[in-house]
């Protein structure tokens, strides 16, 4: 498990070793440059997690007969946003597993029996649709019935206060991430 601090150290000892922001290869990124480098790390992670399915999560959606478009946003979650002013909190998250606004793309949808529903198939009566990346459209919703949505998820955004947090990336992609950060720093 590689932490953000380790990624910064690796950058300072390799791709960024010959520039001022890396303490000239002494094993760290100077404090005033960390926010900029971490911004590039976040951009690189978002690009990789968007192009390759590196994280999947699922969420339960409770249907209401008058709602056809279900926006996968935390303001519609039961626990993620306790102060929500939304009248219908249809995302059924849990207190210890709150929904995060991390949807890249909806991948699969399952009904309450576990059967996979057709996705974006106009030829199927029970098909559900994705008019936007984080919107599930259910043409014929049934109040109280839940569907499970499997989606491609983003990497959590990292900050300068997250140096001990794990960068959730397969080992083989860290070199790609470092190369992307170097490209952004030098361009």
Predicted regions: what is each one?
Residues 1-187:
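Glycine-enriched, solvent-exposed interface loops adjoining structured elements
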């Amino acid at each position: 498990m590689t932490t953000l601090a380790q990624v910064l150290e690796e950058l300072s000892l390799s791709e960024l070793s010959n520039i001022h922001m890396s303490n000239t290869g002494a094993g760290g990124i100077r404090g005033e440059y960390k926010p900029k480098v971490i911004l590039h790390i976040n951009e690189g992670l978002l690009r990789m997690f968007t192009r390759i399915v590196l994280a999947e999560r699922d969420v339960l959606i409770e249907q209401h007969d008058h709602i056809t478009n279900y926006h996968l946003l935390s303001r519609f979650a039961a626990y993620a946003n306790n102060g929500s002013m939304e009248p219908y909190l249809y995302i059924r998250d849990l207190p210890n597993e709150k929904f995060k606004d991390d949807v890249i793309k909806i991948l699969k949808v399952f009904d309450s029996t576990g059967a996979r529903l057709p996705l974006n198939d106009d030829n199927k009566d029970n098909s559900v649709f994705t008019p936007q990346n984080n919107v599930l459209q259910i043409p014929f919703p049934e109040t109280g019935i839940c569907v499970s949505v499997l989606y491609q998820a983003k990497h959590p955004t990292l900050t300068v206060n997250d140096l001990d947090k794990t960068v959730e990336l397969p080992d083989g992609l860290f070199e790609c991430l470092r190369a992307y950060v170097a490209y952004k720093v030098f361009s």
